[in-house]
């Protein structure tokens, strides 16, 4: 399973990249907003430049989301994003217009990610429209007392049934168990906040064992 980092923070991306486990990046307007110090002066060019900087850090897919709602505007914006770097993947929301944009962009050879997916029906439509990736949001489903990981399992099964090549990106990950369950289900990718990536490496028995080893290492002459 591939690991993407779900952030627009350059320091977090660099830190994750230094671990040697990073395969790509996902961003969205909310994540971009978190890193903007002065929203009043942040321009479209600033946004495009930021995506370019991410592409310079990570040698893998960098997902950037459109900020328009009608199909024609999404296509136009998607073409602009794709022109930034060969690694850019254009995220489009799973709406009727989003499906039209995904189809059009895919026909132009531009990779797409159908985002804000919350049902198997939406995921099937995304694959049929030509999306390279589909992003079910598990945490947001959990928030409304629905089993988000069950949706991932359904999508993986449906895609396997018909040999659909759309890759499943498990999104809205909240904790390490989401990552484990994604791997067990057979999802292609988990996109993970940096805080959760760090949690994946932690275990109290590792800490206890290391403490004991270091105490015992005192007998080794320096």
From Swiss-Prot:
Database matches in Gene3D superfamilies: Aldolase class I
Cell location: Cytoplasm
Residue ranges of coiled coil: none
Pathway of action: Carbohydrate degradation; pentose phosphate pathway; D-glyceraldehyde 3-phosphate and beta-D-fructose 6-phosphate from D-ribose 5-phosphate and D-xylulose 5-phosphate (non-oxidative stage): step 2/3
Annotated InterPro entries: Aldolase_TIM, TAL/FSA, Transaldolase_3B, Transaldolase_3B/F6P_aldolase, Transaldolase_AS, TSA/FSA_arc/bac
Uppermost EC category: transferase
Reaction equations catalysed: D-sedoheptulose 7-phosphate + D-glyceraldehyde 3-phosphate = D-erythrose 4-phosphate + beta-D-fructose 6-phosphate
Protein origin, superkingdom: Bacteria
GO molecular function, one term: aldehyde-lyase activity
Any one Pfam family match given in the protein's UniProt record, by short name: TAL_FSA
Gene Ontology terms: cellular component: cytoplasm
GO biological-process terms attached to the record: carbohydrate metabolic process; pentose-phosphate shunt
Keywords, in A-Z order: Cytoplasm, Pentose shunt, Schiff base, Transferase
Assigned EC number: 2.2.1.2
Keyword Zinc annotated: no
Active-site residues from the entry: 91
Similarity-based family: Belongs to the transaldolase family. Type 3B subfamily.
Function (record text): Transaldolase is important for the balance of metabolites in the pentose-phosphate pathway.
Protein name: Probable transaldolase
Organism: Chlorobium luteolum (strain DSM 273 / BCRC 81028 / 2530)
């Amino acid at each position: 399973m591939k690991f993407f980092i779900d952030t627009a923070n350059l320091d977090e991306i660099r830190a994750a990249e230094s671990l040697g486990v990073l395969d790509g990046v996902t961003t969205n307007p909310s994540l971009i907003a978190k890193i903007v110090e002065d929203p009043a002066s942040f321009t479209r060019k600033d946004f495009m430049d930021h995506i370019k900087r991410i592409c310079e850090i990570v040698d893998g897919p960098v997902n950037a989301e459109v900020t328009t709602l009608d199909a024609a505007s999404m296509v136009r914006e998607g073409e602009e994003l794709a022109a930034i770097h060969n690694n850019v993947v254009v995220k489009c929301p799973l709406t009727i217009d989003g499906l039209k944009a995904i189809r059009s962009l895919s026909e132009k050879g531009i990779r797409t990610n159908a985002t804000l997916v919350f049902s198997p029906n939406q995921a099937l439509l995304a694959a049929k429209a030509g999306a390279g990736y589909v992003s079910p949001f598990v945490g947001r489903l959990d928030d409304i007392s629905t089993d988000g990981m069950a949706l991932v399992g359904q999508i993986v099964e449906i895609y396997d049934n018909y040999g659909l090549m759309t890759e499943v990106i498990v999104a809205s990950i909240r904790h390490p168990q989401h990552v484990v369950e994604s791997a067990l289900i057979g999802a292609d990718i988990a996109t993970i906040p940096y805080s959760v990536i760090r949690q994946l490496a932690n275990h109290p028995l590792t800490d206890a064992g290391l403490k004991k080893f270091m105490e015992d290492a005192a007998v080794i002459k320096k």
